[in-house]
């Protein structure tokens, strides 16, 4: 009488893919079904028949999984499956399930979504139009299943913004009142603890005992009622999606039904901006419902439920242990009891899974934002450190003249100077002639100064000349490192300096200080500084040092007798007024013909202005004026003079005073009078003695008529 329902080879595979105990789609089983149907000519027809039988199941999960399998078959099995899905049998089964009163709303929404998608897929084939007819009929009979159309993006008006601001102020006021109410209940103790633990606001409003409450407590209880009544983004923090939303423009947020979206701000009149799973965009308000913030009672109940679920963890672990150790055929009452207890917490466990899954997504999103912000900061920091700001040099172009009209630090570059007198040609090191000052025991030749003259004074090793009457003219030409022959006609012994082994460069090192007339030799016939105007012949080649390289040098400024010798005559008084006299001995000049003044320009300053050549000027005590007359030719042409070294000075340094005629004897001995007997001792020099004289004479001796400085013509320069 009754025929058994026919079965197909695909019933088992589809039943496995749509098991009611599944918590999510089993895509492995679904793809296995698709592979079998694609490889079988009758697979599409038999698979659709198995799907129709699974749609008749009373479990909503089975119905949802069956619709998902049908969607997978339509996308993977081609044209034969499209014809079977658009058949009259399958479409009638869908409409029947959607129109039943006991069908779950999610199943109805899934059927509507599937028929719409298949209608769009089959619209190019006229033979498959039955699917579009089924979709149209389902939409007419169940208008509530169709998601609403997205509203227009209208800009917010001033009224809307004012309303949002008012709701924000109300929410802030309610929050402050709630905080005040909590502060008032805190010191009340156990007697006032019934207020926060009471059930709900409507129950409190209907309680007659509220008449005895004070006005402050009644006012504090009022804010509990309007909670969650906000309608703007300023007062709503979360919304739940009612439908699936697929973005149609850039900047819109995609979400599925049931997703909870965090509200950020209002963008348009019916569009808000929200954040979901790390993405931000706008969404329509008619696709979501507002969620009120949980009340303290709700939070307490949620915490209690969570504690109950975690308390069952021991039973779950015990059940798993018994199931893994006991045999399959053995029935145990303990296992059945534990299974019932653990099954009771399944709905609560699902809610907790959803809750913590959402929290996990929120924390993951926050972590991604933090990592991105940190990377941006590190990138900016590296960029700023790898490209430091360049200094602006223009701000140093002009500096104030801090020291009396000194030139600016960055003068304009011009053509090089062509005047050779302004440059130092290559020659001896500048330190060859260090500055020197006269000895404190030095006395000026000429005896007592005149009534109009002032005695010189000495400051820190340098002499400051006195300013008295006019000074006589003297000529101070640049010196020459060559030798000269004294009037006796005998060449003195040559002394070696530290640069005796190498000749000076051919360029004139003294050309920067004078412009003499036609000169002979390498250094231009310099004039002797300690005489009035005396030309010196120039040696055309360097002379070796007869004393050896280890011979000691004379002092830089003072002769040997000034440091080590004993004065041979009483010195003349330094000033007419009398005072402390300092001994000093100098050698007289005899049998010297006074030379004529030379027409040679004196040095204009430089490295010789304060060095060995200033001894003659120091003898006067004042800076001598510049001579204008021409110098006579040298008395003995071709003669050479000794280049006296400077003791303790740099290489090549020489003292000009030791090359004067007064410092050399007539026979030019290799070692001066009183000098050392060995090269290691300090040399001493004797005074000049003319031929026929028995010994040196003091400058003040009146018995020397041939003394140059005692002659009437010879004292004119002093």
UniProtKB/Swiss-Prot annotation:
Similarity-based family: Belongs to the STAM family.
Lineage of origin: Eukaryota, Fungi, Dikarya, Ascomycota, Pezizomycotina
Positions of region (Disordered): 142-164, 178-230, 384-718
Superkingdom: Eukaryota
Gene Ontology CC entries for this record: endosome membrane; ESCRT-0 complex
Subcellular location: Endosome membrane
Keywords: Endosome, Membrane, Protein transport, SH3 domain, Transport
Name of the gene this protein is made from: HSE1
Compositional bias annotation for Pro residues: 408-438, 624-637
Any one biological process term the GO annotation gives: protein transport to vacuole involved in ubiquitin-dependent protein catabolic process via the multivesicular body sorting pathway
Topological category with respect to the lipid bilayer: Peripheral membrane protein
Residue intervals of the UIM domain: 163-182
One annotated GO molecular function: phosphatidylinositol binding
Protein's UniProt name: Class E vacuolar protein-sorting machinery protein HSE1
Bias (Polar residues) ranges: 521-534
Domain VHS: 17-146
Biased composition (Low complexity): 187-202, 210-221, 509-520, 581-604, 665-680, 689-706
Domain SH3 residue range list: 234-293
PROSITE patterns per UniProt: SH3 (PS50002), UIM (PS50330), VHS (PS50179)
Protein function: Component of the ESCRT-0 complex which is the sorting receptor for ubiquitinated cargo proteins at the multivesicular body (MVB).
Organism: Pyricularia oryzae (strain 70-15 / ATCC MYA-4617 / FGSC 8958) (Rice blast fungus)
Subunit record text: Component of the ESCRT-0 complex composed of HSE1 and VPS27.
Pfam family, one: SH3_1
């Amino acid at each position: 009488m009754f025929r058994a329902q026919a079965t197909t080879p695909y019933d088992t595979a589809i039943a496995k893919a749509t098991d009611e105990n599944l918590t999510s789609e089993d895509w492995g089983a679904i793809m296995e079904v698709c592979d079998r149907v694609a490889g079988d000519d009758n697979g599409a027809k038999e698979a659709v028949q198995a799907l129709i039988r699974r749609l008749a199941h009373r479990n909503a999960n089975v119905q949802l999984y069956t619709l998902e399998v049908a969607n997978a078959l339509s996308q993977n099995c081609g044209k034969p499956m499209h014809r079977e899905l658009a058949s009259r049998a399958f479409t009638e089964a869908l409409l029947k399930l959607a129109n039943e009163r006991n069908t779950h709303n999610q199943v109805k929404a899934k059927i509507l979504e599937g028929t719409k998608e298949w209608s769009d897929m089959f619209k190019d084939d006229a033979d498959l139009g039955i699917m579009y007819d089924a979709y149209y009929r389902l939409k007419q009979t169940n208008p509530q299943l169709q998601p609403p159309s997205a509203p227009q993006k209208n800009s917010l008006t001033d009224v809307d913004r004012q309303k949002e601001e008012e709701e924000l102020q109300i929410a802030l006021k309610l929050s402050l009142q709630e905080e005040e109410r909590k502060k008032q209940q805190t010191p009340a103790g156990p007697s006032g603890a019934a207020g926060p633990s009471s059930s709900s606001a409507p129950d409190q409003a209907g309680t007659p005992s509220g008449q005895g409450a004070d006005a402050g407590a009644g006012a504090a209880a009022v804010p509990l009622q309007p909670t969650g009544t906000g309608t703007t983004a300023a007062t709503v923090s979360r919304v739940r999606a009612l439908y699936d939303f697929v973005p149609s423009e850039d900047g819109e947020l995609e979400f599925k039904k049931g997703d909870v979206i965090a509200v950020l701000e209002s963008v348009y009149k019916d569009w808000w901006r929200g954040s979901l799973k790390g993405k931000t965009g706008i969404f329509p308000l008619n696709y979501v419902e507002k969620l009120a913030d949980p009340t303290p009672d709700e939070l307490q109940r949620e915490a209690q439920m969570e504690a109950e679920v975690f308390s069952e963890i021991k039973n779950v672990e015990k059940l798993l242990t018994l199931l893994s150790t006991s045999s399959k055929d053995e029935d145990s009452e303990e296992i059945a009891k534990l299974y019932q207890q653990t099954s009771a917490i399944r709905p609560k466990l699902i809610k907790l899974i959803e809750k913590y899954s959402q929290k996990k997504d929120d924390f993951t999103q926050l972590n991604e934002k933090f990592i991105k912000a940190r990377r941006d900061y590190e990138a900016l920091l590296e960029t700023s450190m790898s490209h430091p700001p360049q200094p602006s040099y223009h701000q140093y172009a002009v500096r104030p003249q801090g020291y009396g009209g000194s030139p600016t630090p960055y003068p304009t570059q011009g053509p090089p100077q062509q005047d050779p007198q302004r440059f130092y040609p290559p020659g001896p090191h500048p330190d060859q002639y260090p500055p020197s000052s006269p000895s404190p025991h030095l006395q000026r030749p000429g005896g007592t100064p005149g009534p109009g003259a002032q005695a010189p004074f000495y400051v820190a090793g340098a002499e400051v000349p006195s300013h008295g009457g006019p000074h006589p003219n003297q000529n101070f030409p640049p010196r020459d490192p060559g030798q000269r022959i004294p009037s006796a006609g005998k060449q003195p012994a040559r002394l070696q300096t530290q640069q005796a082994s190498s000749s000076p460069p051919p360029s004139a090192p003294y050309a920067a200080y004078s412009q003499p007339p036609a000169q002979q030799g390498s250094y231009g016939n310099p004039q002797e500084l300690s005489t009035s105007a005396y030309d010196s012949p120039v040696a055309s080649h360097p002379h070796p040092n007869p004393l050896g390289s280890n011979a000691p040098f004379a002092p830089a400024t003072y002769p040997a007798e000034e440091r080590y010798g004993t004065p041979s005559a009483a010195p003349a008084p330094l000033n007419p007024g009398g005072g402390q006299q300092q001994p000093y001995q100098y050698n007289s000049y005899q049998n010297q013909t006074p030379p004529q003044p030379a027409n040679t320009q004196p040095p204009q300053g430089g490295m010789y202005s304060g060095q060995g050549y200033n001894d003659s000027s120091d003898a006067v005590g004042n800076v001598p004026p510049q001579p204008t007359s021409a110098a006579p030719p040298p008395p003995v042409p071709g003669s050479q003079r000794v280049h006296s070294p400077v003791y303790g000075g740099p290489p090549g340094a020489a003292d000009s005073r030791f090359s004067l005629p007064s410092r050399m004897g007539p026979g030019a001995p290799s070692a001066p009078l009183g000098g050392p007997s060995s090269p290691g001792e300090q040399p001493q020099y004797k005074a000049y003695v003319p031929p026929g004289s028995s010994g040196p004479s003091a400058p003040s001796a009146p018995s020397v008529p041939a003394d140059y400085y005692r002659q009437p013509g010879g004292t004119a320069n002093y």
